[in-house]
């Protein structure tokens, strides 16, 4: 409400996460934010190369390795081939947990088309790649924001709609 009011009073201020969600809701265009796509972008939209040549599915996976969790390490450029890392069983397995259409509580969620499921985040926060939606903080946050955005869109308020579209352009 505060950010909407700022915009109504003439201060252009974009709420970044809401803008990403609105782009998913109001347009056919991708956001480029790999956490809000299905499958999630881990290992397929980008990877992280570490100083020692290790290749991780995401920066979060690289950070987990700092705590001795190497599960999301695809290999090492000095030891493994491209095929081994990017067409190997590990990446295929990880991606199988990155599709909201296949995950419990995501596949039948009304907001599923606007979300993503990050197996790295789930492993880090909940101990497995699926995660448990009722206690998943990212899920709770995203669903509550999407619900709020739909409430505002449902009002058909021309001023709010103008603000939302200004965030997308």
Where are these regions (language model features)?
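C-terminal accessory region of radical SAM enzymes
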Residues: 1-28, 61-107
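Short, electropositive alpha-helical surface patch
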Residues: 25-38
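Short, acidic, Ser/Thr-enriched surface-loop or helix-capping motifs
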Residues: 50
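Short, small/polar residue-rich loop motifs at catalytic or cofactor-binding pockets
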Residues: 40-43
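Short acidic/histidine-rich active-site segments
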Residues: 58
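Radical SAM enzyme core and accessory elements
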Residues: 10, 63-64, 72, 77, ...
């Amino acid at each position: 409400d505060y950010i909407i009011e700022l915009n109504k009073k003439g201060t252009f201020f974009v709420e970044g996460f809401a803008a990403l969600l609105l782009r998913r809701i109001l347009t056919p265009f991708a956001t480029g934010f790999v956490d809000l796509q299905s499958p999630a972008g881990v290992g397929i939209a980008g990877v992280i190369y570490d100083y020692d040549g290790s290749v991780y599915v995401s920066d979060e996976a690289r950070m987990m390795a700092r705590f001795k969790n190497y599960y999301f390490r695809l290999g090492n450029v000095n030891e493994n081939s491209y095929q081994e890392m990017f067409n190997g069983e590990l990446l295929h397995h990880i991606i199988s947990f990155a599709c909201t259409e296949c995950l419990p509580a995501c596949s039948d969620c009304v907001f599923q088309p606007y979300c993503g499921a990050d197996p790295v985040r789930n492993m880090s926060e909940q101990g497995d790649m699926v995660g448990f939606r009722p206690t998943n903080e990212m899920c709770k946050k995203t669903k509550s924001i999407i619900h709020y955005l739909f409430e505002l869109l449902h009002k058909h308020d021309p001023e709010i709609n103008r603000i939302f579209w200004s965030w997308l352009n």
